[in-house]
Amino acid sequence: KTSSASRSKTDEDRFTNHFVSMKLPLVHGTSGSFFALCSGSQTPVWEQTTLKESAFGSISPKGIALAMDLVEKHTTFQDVWAARDEAVLAGLAEHAPGILEPLAKMGPDLWSVVDRLPRLGRVFFAAHLRMPRPADAVLSGWHAVNCLREWRGDTHWALVTAADLSGPAPSILHNAWIGYEKDWLATSRGSTADETAAAWDALEARGLAADGEVNASGLDLRQRMEDETDRLTALPWTLLG
């Protein structure tokens, strides 16, 4: 039986190969594909630096700029978007074949919900809405779910902002809440060692960490943000019925 870890590694390798084939160099052990995919729906407005720095949450603005530059030099955002769609269909067929038919059938109802959600303050959600909706029924259903995910994510980041967390600090709290290896998430999102160290100092100054570890207060804040995110993002499921 294949373990979830080995499946994830296989998926990562397959996904990375898509971007290597487009001559996208590897960054921090992975491709710049994550930044490129997230931003694909927002180009060309991302040429404005302030948007790059404000909409990606705890992802390093420098990493975002690097990924943008790599895409512009070696491929197009449309090709990156298409490669992701191809990988999604292949991954669903291989790892979750049982949801293909339900996802295709639910697509129209999901889009009906998506179209009724408020857009104010939801940058990624609104940007994804401007992208063409796939003709493939399965992929269309997946894109609708992805829009719901982005709507939740935008809502969550509003709460992170309200908690006065910025830079690598949200990644540090989330990293501890999930139980990842220390500083893995901040590093994977492009933060430098100095930036991460400064974030630790800021968290300790607020009583959210001590001696290089997120403490109970920090974990409680992260849990409260998650609970409030759940409360504020119940609307799609209420509309779906």
Residue ranges and their predicted role:
Residues 190-241:
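Accessory, usually C-terminal, subdomains that scaffold auxiliary metal cofactors
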